[in-house]
Every structure is written in structure tokens, then in C-alpha cells.
């Protein structure tokens, strides 16, 4: 199953990156850098500074989202990662509506997609996710989607064949001379998995950002410079059961500055 999932993800991901080599297929793209500072993280050192690069695009047959975090532990040392680490996700999706050139809308669903994600952290920390995705038409939202994944990990660590539900959203509220943007996602893993290396527990990560468009307020251009905060609520972080000896329920608000370019 792992090899099949990995091959499917690799092949589809290569197809999903075709816009890099065929500019006429690329409909839009955007990049950003984000700085975060927060305290009271769990499992890892409690103070963290993070620099995040993000890329998003929409192309002829789907869309792609990529982010890479560089995380600094403010001089403290993580037992397995040292004083800093990295983590990233690559998430291409293929639109069946666009590939088949037909409208696949029903109810609140605007389109049906094949959703994939490759997660990669430091060390033997990688996972492949694949499943159906749905773009939803929710009044007032800039976008709203739901991806339903089957997770498989690389190597023998636990976390195989468990289901993950990932909604994502974006909503804009006019505020004075500018706007407040509320966007984010939630990862909800509904199953447990156990191997000789341990147990991966069901977990839920709710991760919205609340951002004020400072660039628009200062007449520097809309959707270029944001300030605000990111909130991370993670129950049973990393799939670690909080009922054990390690506190793994996390609730952290981080100061945020984000620049789009």
C-alpha cells in the first residue's frame, strides 16, 4: 500500500508541477514570507520563532500549495532536532472537472479533485497522503475546501492507513480603511495506529491566522503586508496521547508578520 500510494503521489505531483514548465497553463501564482513568534509550545521547546515560505498556484488542471518552515527554538535544544529544525508540505490537487471538461457541481460542491500531500520533517519524518478533495461554495468565503486523506508514513513508524480530514478556508471582513483576513486549516486524524515502534494516536490541529492588511491601510498596496496572529490548537500533538506522561495538548497564539511578493 505504501509503495502504491508513494508512486501515485509522485506521478500525480509531477503532473501537477507541469505549470513550471508550461507557462501558458499557469493561471496565477503567489509567494509569501511569514515571521512567527510564540510561547508555550508543547513537546518541543516552549518558545519558537518560525520563518515560513509559501507558494500557491492554480493551473489548467488543478492547484498546488507548498510551504516550508524553518523553526528556531530560541537558544534551547530539542532532544531529537537540536536548536532548530525544518518542516514542509507539498500539496498538489488535480481537478476532475477540469480534466474531464465538465461541471461536477452538486449541492455546495463546486468541483471534485484528487488531493495529495507529501509531509517532510527532519530525520525519518515523512508521510504520504492521498484522497478525494472538494471545493465548496460557501457564501461569504473567498474559498473553502475539504480534503479527505488516507495517511501512510515512510518507514516503520506508526501512523499508517489512518484517515485525515482537512478543511481550509479564507474569509475577508472590511475594517475601516482596510480589511481583516481570517484564513487557515484544520487537520483531524480520526484513527489510531500501533506498530512495534509505538502508537500513533488520533489528533486534531486547528490552525487559523487572523491578519490585518496593513499595506492597504498605509496605501502601500492591498494584500501585500499583513500583521496579526496565528493560533495553534493541537490536541494530542504529533499523535502523542496526552493521557500519558507527556503533555501534548497545545494552545499557542503567535505574533505574525507576513509579506506577499
Report the location of each language-model feature.
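N-terminal signal peptide c-region/cleavage motif recognized by signal peptidases
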Residues: 17-19
Amino acid at each position: 500500500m505504501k509503495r502504491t500510494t508513494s508512486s501515485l503521489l509522485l506521478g500525480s505531483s509531477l503532473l501537477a508541477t507541469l505549470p513550471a514548465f508550461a507557462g501558458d497553463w499557469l493561471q496565477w501564482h503567489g509567494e509569501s514570507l511569514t515571521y512567527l513568534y510564540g510561547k508555550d509550545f508543547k513537546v518541543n521547546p516552549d518558545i519558537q520563532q518560525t520563518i515560513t515560505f509559501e507558494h500557491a498556484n492554480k493551473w489548467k488542471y488543478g492547484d498546488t500549495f507548498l510551504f516550508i518552515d524553518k523553526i528556531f527554538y530560541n537558544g534551547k535544544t530539542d532532544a531529537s532536532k537540536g536548536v532548530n529544525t525544518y518542516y514542509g508540505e507539498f500539496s498538489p490537487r488535480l481537478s476532475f472537472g477540469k480534466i474531464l471538461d465538465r461541471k461536477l457541481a452538486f449541492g455546495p460542491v463546486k468541483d471534485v479533485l484528487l488531493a495529495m500531500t507529501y509531509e517532510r520533517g527532519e530525520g525519518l519524518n515523512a508521510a504520504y497522503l492521498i484522497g478525494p478533495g472538494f471545493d465548496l461554495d460557501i457564501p461569504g468565503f473567498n474559498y473553502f475546501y475539504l480534503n479527505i486523506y488516507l495517511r501512510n508514513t515512510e518507514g516503520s513508524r506508526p501512523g499508517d492507513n489512518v484517515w485525515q480530514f482537512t478543511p481550509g478556508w479564507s474569509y475577508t471582513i472590511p475594517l475601516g480603511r482596510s480589511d481583516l483576513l481570517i484564513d487557515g486549516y484544520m487537520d483531524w486524524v480520526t484513527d489510531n495506529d500501533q506498530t512495534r515502534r509505538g502508537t500513533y494516536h488520533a489528533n486534531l490541529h486547528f490552525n487559523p491566522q487572523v491578519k490585518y492588511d496593513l499595506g492597504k491601510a498605509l496605501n502601500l498596496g492591498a494584500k501585500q503586508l499583513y500583521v496579526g496572529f496565528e493560533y495553534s490548537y493541537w490536541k494530542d500533538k504529533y499523535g502523542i496521547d496526552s493521557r500519558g506522561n507527556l503533555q501534548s495538548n497545545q494552545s499557542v497564539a503567535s505574533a505574525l508578520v507576513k509579506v506577499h511578493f
